[in-house]
Amino acid sequence: FENGQAYENMCYHDVAPAVALPAPGTVVLRFFAPDATCVEVAGIGGGMGNTHHVMKRSTEEDGWWEITLHDIPEGFHYHEYFVDGNRCLNPHAPIGYGCFRPINYFEMPGEDSSFYYLNDVPHGDIRMEQYRSPVTGRIKACWVYTPPGYDYAHTESYPVLYLQHGVGENETGWIW
């Protein structure tokens, strides 16, 4: 604060989305880098390929860079940004964990993708539990899903599924 007023950069500003899906198979990606001389985006395999696509500086001179990509197949797409040759996360776009690191992603919906939409049906709960590992002695985390209507005080038994994510990601990949 300066003289009782918040600094301008501490205020929320309306920002256009960094990922937009204006039509099937089309994605618009935006990155804020006002001092950059070059911004690129590349997919991690999949429909975007590994090609570096050079983004164009916004004509509004507002620090944003943008690119529109077409023919992107439906599904989940990891991608990464390069600002003046340096790999960077886009803080304005969704960030997940894959390829052994935090990484940006987007999901291109398709005709058969309605199964993962938030539908109007009963939902269970997901909680993170912490425990001390008897092997390492360290605090670890696990995620517990309980079905709709589950009551911790109830004596009814429920089946258990133990699910461990494989190489390159972690357990959050199953719940986000």
Please provide the spans of the model-predicted regions.
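Non-catalytic, glycine-rich low-complexity segments
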Residues: F1-A33, P109-D120
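Aromatic-rich carbohydrate-binding modules that target alpha-glucans
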Residues: A20-P22, V28-E74, D84-E111, T146
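Short, flexible loop/turn elements at secondary-structure junctions
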Residues: D35, R132-V135, P148, G166-G168
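Short, hydrophobic/aromatic-rich segments at coil-to-beta transitions
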Residues: W64, V121-E129
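Hydrophobic loop/turn residues within beta-sheet-rich immunoglobulin-like superfamily modules
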Residues: H70-I72, P134, T155
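A short loop-to-beta-strand scaffold at the N-terminal edge of the catalytic core in hydrolase folds
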Residues: T136-A153
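Short substrate-entry loop that stabilizes the transition state in hydrolases
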Residues: Y150-W176
